[in-house]
Each structure stands twice: as C-alpha cells, then as structure tokens.
C-alpha cells in the first residue's frame, strides 16, 4: 500500500506526522469520496512530488472517475482563487474588493460531484494555501448545507498532515543531496 510506503519514508524526528497520517486517513470518519477527494486535492496542493506519487494511486482506486477529476479540479481552481482572493483581502486598499474578478470559475458551479464534496475539498486546499477569505466562504457554504464542524475540521486535519508530510519529505530529500 502506498500509504504505508509514505509513512515509512517519514523520518523518526517527525514520528507525530507518521502517526497522524495513519490516523487522518486510516481512521477518518469522512465518507470515502470526501476522504479520498480531500487526500488527492491536498496532495496536489502540497506541491510535493513524493506525496502526490504515493497517495494518488490509492485516491484514484477509491474515487469514481468523476470524483477523481473533480478533486483535481478543486486543487486547480483553488490554486488560482486562493492567490487572487488572499491578495485582495491583504491589500490595504478596500477598493480592490469592489472590482470584478473577471476570472472563470465555472467548475465551482458544476463540479461533476456533490457540491458539498467539492466545497470540502476546496476548503481543505484553501487551508494549505492560506486564504482566509476562501476558508470563510467555503465553510459558510458547507455549514448552510448542514455539514457539521467536526466534518470540516476532519478535512482540515487531512490537509494539515498532508502538507506537513510534504514539507518534511521534500526538505529531507534536499538535505540528503
């Protein structure tokens, strides 16, 4: 199993990450589609080749073709939106917030899977990319759809652990050169 290979690659000094990776994926209360879509979208957002290579096959095996594509779409559109909306939020001039975005985001309206799943994946990617405005927006949509805070936090835990594993393994690869 690729998850076991990924866990075994984590150095001893990051044992907490190894344990957390096993628990957030192996013991998650999220339904399979939500879990593996979150895993795939976050593996992409982590920008870690090792993490993506190890987690993608299992994600693909646990997702329908539509969900697999939608999770990749969530990572792609959030890569754009998180930069755009984080910048608008951080700029001191509030007038930027009144300007039309002018960016295509059609996939958000028609992701090819349940809207709640896509929103959850988008929220998790937004956590990795650090866009508070996007986090708030996706959290509000999820809460209005009846998603509880525990489910939202579970997706954020998956995001945080995958990101930390990616940073750790990529740093170790560089230091080993």
UniProtKB/Swiss-Prot annotation:
E.C. numbers: 1.11.1.28
Record InterPro entries: AhpD, AhpD-like, AhpD_core, CMD-like
Active site per UniProt: 131, 134
Keyword field contains Nucleus: no
Record keywords: Antioxidant, Disulfide bond, Oxidoreductase, Peroxidase, Redox-active center
UniProt entry tagged with the keyword Disulfide bond: yes
Subunit structure: Homotrimer.
Record's catalysed reaction(s): N(6)-[(R)-dihydrolipoyl]-L-lysyl-[lipoyl-carrier protein] + a hydroperoxide = N(6)-[(R)-lipoyl]-L-lysyl-[lipoyl-carrier protein] + an alcohol + H2O
Protein name: Alkyl hydroperoxide reductase AhpD
Biological role stated in the UniProt entry: Antioxidant protein with alkyl hydroperoxidase activity. Required for the reduction of the AhpC active site cysteine residues and for the regeneration of the AhpC enzyme activity.
Designated gene of the protein: ahpD
GO molecular function: alkyl hydroperoxide reductase activity; disulfide oxidoreductase activity; hydroperoxide reductase activity; peroxiredoxin activity
Family (UniProt): Belongs to the AhpD family.
Cystine residue pairs: 131-134
Domain of life: Bacteria
GO biological process: cell redox homeostasis; response to oxidative stress
Pfam families referenced in this protein's UniProt entry, alphabetically: CMD
